[in-house]
């Protein structure tokens, strides 16, 4: 039996939002959950879990649904802007420069 990853409440809400957005995209295209499942090569139950934002579903299944809906490219924006990482990177570069004096 698969187990769900324990997520913080904020992270769980993000995953639920992604699932809801996938469901809206499917409904806007007038595609049944069974048809999406068939196209994605997953079960209808997995589509239902994705649309509920379940953390036990693989990221590959989420991406396959996005691909079937013509939205896989939107996944490329994930972590594209990383202000915190940039801050750490800049701080590290400043420290490295000080070491060379």
Model-derived regions, located:
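A short, Lys/Arg-rich alpha-helix, primarily the initiator
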Residues: 3-28
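Short basic helix-loop element that most often maps to the first helix and adjoining turn
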Residues: 20-35, 96-101
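Alpha-helical residues within the helix-turn-helix
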Residues: 27, 38, 67
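Short, basic-rich loop-to-helix N-cap that marks the start of a DNA-contacting helix
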Residues: 54-66
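Short, charged recognition helix plus adjacent turn
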Residues: 76-101
